[in-house]
Design a protein with these regions (language model features):
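Conserved C-terminal guanine-recognition region of P-loop GTPase G domains, centered on the G4
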Residues: 23, 27-97
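Canonical P-loop GTPase G-domain recognition
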Residues: 74-131
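A short hydrophobic beta-strand->loop->alpha-helix junction that borders the nucleotide-binding pocket
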Residues: 12-14, 44, 99-102
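Gly-rich Lys/Arg/Thr-decorated short loops/hinges at beta-loop-alpha junctions or inter-strand turns
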Residues: 12-13, 35-38, 68-69, 193-199
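Short, small-residue-biased leader/transition segments that mark boundaries at the very start
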Residues: 2-11
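Switch/connector loops and helix/strand junctions flanking conserved nucleotide-binding motifs
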Residues: 17-19, 49-51, 75-80, 104-109, ...
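Conserved nucleotide-sensing/catalytic segment adjacent to the nucleotide-binding pocket
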Residues: 12-22
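Extended helical scaffolds that flank P-loop GTPase cores
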Residues: 93-95, 120-238
Length: 239
C-alpha cells in the first residue's frame, strides 16, 4: 500500500500499441475492466513521447483515474528538449508529471498525484479524440451511434461504453462477445461502420488509428520541444 491506505496499482509502460490483437492489450484491459483498479500510473519515455502516447489514449478510454509520468525528463532536458506540462495536461485531461526514475526526481510528486486521483476517483477529462482529420465528423458520428446502441449492454458487462464502441469499430470479437449483442444490433452496428468507412475513405481500423495518430501529432506539436538525438537514440533508429 502507498500512503493513505490506498493499494498500489500496477505500472503500465506505454511501450507497445494496444491493438485488438496483442496479448499486452488483452492482459491490460482484462485487468482494468475485471479488477477495477483505483488508478493507473502510466509511465512513458519522455525522449520518445510520440511513439508512446498511443497506448495512453487507449488506457484513457477505459475511464479509470490515471496519471501520466514522463520518465527520463533529465535526459530530454540535457539534450535541449522540454515539455509544456500544463498544456499537455489541458489537452489530455489528466495529470502529467515529469520524473527521472533513475535519479528519483519527481517521484514523490507522482505518488501524490496518483493518490489524489485514486482517492477522489478523478477520471480522464477527455476521451473523444476526433479532430479535423475526421472530415465531416464521420468517425465521431460512428462511435456515438454505436454508443447509443450498446449503452445497456456495456453497463451490464462492466465495460466502459466509449472503449467498447471504439473496439467494435476496430473489429474486436472479444468485446463483441462480452456485450452479448443480438443479430439485429450487430447488423445495425455493421451498417454504421460501413457508412463511416465510405465517408472517410479508410477501412475501420485505419480510421480509428488515423484519429489517434492525428491527435498525438497535434499534442506533440503543441507541447513538446524536441531534443537533439543522443548517440544512443541515433544508433537505435539505425537498427
Amino acid at each position: 500500500e502507498i500512503g493513505l491506505g490506498i493499494p498500489a496499482e500496477p505500472l503500465f509502460r506505454s511501450s507497445c500499441l494496444m491493438s485488438p490483437y496483442t496479448s499486452e492489450e488483452i492482459v491490460t484491459r482484462q485487468f482494468i475492466i475485471g479488477e477495477k483498479p483505483t488508478g493507473i500510473i502510466n509511465i512513458v519515455d519522455a525522449t520518445n513521447i510520440e511513439r508512446n502516447l498511443y497506448l495512453t489514449m487507449q488506457l484513457m478510454e477505459l475511464d479509470t483515474p490515471m496519471v501520466l509520468a514522463l520518465n527520463m525528463m533529465d535526459e530530454m532536458r540535457g539534450n535541449g528538449g522540454t515539455v509544456r506540462i500544463n498544456k499537455m495536461e489541458a489537452m489530455l485531461g489528466i495529470p502529467v508529471v515529469p520524473i527521472s526514475a533513475a535519479k528519483n526526481e519527481g517521484v514523490d510528486e507522482l505518488v501524490d498525484h496518483a493518490l489524489h486521483v485514486a482517492k477522489y476517483q478523478e477520471r480522464p477529462g477527455r476521451m473523444d479524440f476526433c479532430g479535423e482529420e475526421d472530415h465531416g465528423g464521420a468517425v465521431h458520428r460512428c462511435i456515438h451511434g454505436i454508443i447509443h446502441l450498446i449503452e445497456d449492454h456495456a453497463k451490464a458487462a462492466g465495460i466502459p461504453v466509449r472503449f467498447a464502441a471504439t473496439k467494435l469499430v476496430e473489429g474486436d470479437q472479444r468485446i463483441e462477445a462480452a456485450l452479448k449483442l443480438d443479430q439485429n444490433e450487430k447488423e445495425m452496428i455493421e451498417h454504421i461502420i460501413v457508412q463511416m468507412e465510405q465517408e472517410r475513405g479508410l477501412d475501420r481500423a485505419a480510421a480509428i488509428a488515423d484519429m489517434r495518430f492525428h491527435f498525438i501529432h497535434q499534442l506533440v506539436e503543441q507541447t513538446v520541444v524536441k531534443p537533439r538525438q543522443s548517440k544512443e537514440q541515433l544508433r537505435s533508429a539505425q537498427i
